[in-house]
Amino acid sequence: MRHRKAYRKLSKPTPQRKALFKALLISLFKHGKIVTTLPRAKEVTRIAEKLLTIAKEDSVHHRRLVYAWLQDRELVRKVFVEIAPKYKDRNGGYIRILKLGMRRGDAAEQAVIEFV
């Protein structure tokens, strides 16, 4: 059963929400850290942690699972060759969320997501 397997919907339809998460994940893996709102940061962290756990073991199947989210072969190579080996001995907690305070325009709480 999938009881209590909740996630944040962020007031967006499913395809738009998935596209948003893909874009944030691509930026995170490409640049190493990103600034976004706190609810988005928490959801992207959940997905990114799962992708890094998958990437710790290199196989064609795992590369295809990561590619489904990142859609960029060079970025998938970077995840498997550069990023994931750093966390071989670590069980989760690959990403840190730092709160930045409120955004001036709409008072949304900002956060930085970065690799530990």
Curated annotation (Swiss-Prot):
SUPFAM superfamilies: Prokaryotic ribosomal protein L17
Keywords assigned by UniProt, alphabetized: Ribonucleoprotein, Ribosomal protein
Taxonomic superkingdom: Bacteria
Record bears the keyword Ribonucleoprotein: yes
GO molecular-function terms, A-Z: structural constituent of ribosome
Gene Ontology CC annotations of this record: cytosolic large ribosomal subunit
InterPro entries found in the cross-reference section: Ribosomal_bL17, Ribosomal_bL17_CS, Ribosomal_bL17_sf
Signal sequence region: none
Gene3D superfamilies for the chain: Ribosomal protein L17
GO terms of biological process kind: translation
Ribosomal protein is among the record's keywords: yes
Subunit description: Part of the 50S ribosomal subunit. Contacts protein L32.
Family of this protein: Belongs to the bacterial ribosomal protein bL17 family.
PANTHER family documented for this protein: LARGE RIBOSOMAL SUBUNIT PROTEIN BL17M, RIBOSOMAL PROTEIN L17
Name of the protein: Large ribosomal subunit protein bL17
Origin species: Dictyoglomus turgidum (strain DSM 6724 / Z-1310)
